[in-house]
Design a protein with these regions (language model features):
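Short cytoplasmic-facing helical segments at TM-TM junctions of multi-pass membrane proteins
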Residues: 145-186, 210
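Periplasmic/extracellular loop-to-transmembrane helix junction in inner-membrane transport proteins
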Residues: 3-7, 33-77
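N-terminal signal-anchor/first transmembrane alpha helix
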Residues: 1-32
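Transmembrane alpha-helices
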Residues: 132-136, 168-200, 227-228, 232-233, ...
Length: 269
């Protein structure tokens, strides 16, 4: 019997992952052929695979995935440009934190979907609205992470800097360098958030993107193509998350060395 926090070897982790997906796909096959659910609610997996092939050959799946990624990338850059310096200052100066936090803290709990009509009214329905909507969904999360990571900087490190004659700009730079590895680690989740919201943004007056592709399939009741689009989102998001994980391991190898042996089930390997 497994004990609490008992380490699991790499072969066992792989086997458990394969078993989990086999269980999901097997259940999907069974339910779709049992007629317990209508075909539009749960189409046949083989039909979804064929639809995936059609998306690739006939509907420019790769181009649509790239367009969705490009929108997320733009929102990511704008979010970082706002949240990283502001979060650094909030983490460094408590007075600024207590001035801004009462405004931004409630925004993290609000459903972003409720703001979509407001963004359409303010910015129209072009690319600016879509990117702005994604920034709104990402920036408050990143801001909280930056503030938290800056607050974790060891006070002894700051005292050493002061002793060596560092001024405020040098100390802020030191705090940024000390906190950035943790901030970079949050970029994976930030991209996941972007993939979650980009679909909603692309359902409004879009001509490209995975969200547009799914919405177009839904309008003609092609639910096999809808499910194929959903799977495409999952695959694309996983690949980008994996690339960010590789980048983190290359930039900050010491974080992997000192990380705890027990990882959460959803932690990137």
């Amino acid at each position: 019997m497994a004990t609490i926090r008992q380490p699991v070897s790499q072969p066992v982790r792989v086997a458990l992952g394969v078993a989990a997906w086999a269980l999901i796909i097997g259940t999907w096959f069974a339910l779709s052929h049992s007629k317990l659910l209508p075909p539009f609610a749960l189409p046949d997996p083989l039909g979804v695979i064929k639809a995936f092939g059609a998306l690739w050959t006939e509907y420019n799946l790769l181009g649509n995935v790239f367009m969705s990624w490009w929108r997320i990338a733009q929102a990511f850059i704008w979010s970082a440009l706002v949240a990283v310096p502001l979060g650094l200052l909030m983490g460094a100066f408590p007075a600024l934190f207590h001035f801004i936090n009462p405004v931004v803290a409630p925004m993290r709990s609000m459903p972003i979907t409720a703001f979509l009509p407001a963004f359409m009214a303010l910015f129209g329905m072009d690319e600016g609205m879509k990117v702005g909507f994604l920034v709104f969904g990402m920036v408050f999360y990143l801001l909280a992470v930056v503030v938290e990571e800056v607050s974790k900087v060891d006070e002894a490190l700051l005292e050493t800097a002061y002793t060596l004659g560092a001024g405020t700009p040098q100390t802020l730079w030191l705090m940024f360098r000390a906190s950035f590895p943790g901030v970079f680690g949050s970029f994976r989740i930030l991209y996941d958030i972007g993939w979650t919201y980009v679909i909603l943004a692309e359902m409004v007056n879009a001509r490209k993107g995975v969200g547009y592709m799914i919405e177009a399939a839904r309008k003609v009741l092609d639910f096999e193509r809808v499910y194929a689009g959903i799977i495409a989102i999952g695959v694309a998001a996983f690949l980008f998350r994996w690339l960010l994980t590789l980048a983190e391991h290359q930039l900050f190898p010491w974080r992997r060395a000192v990380a705890p042996q027990i990882r959460t089930p959803f932690a990137a390997k």
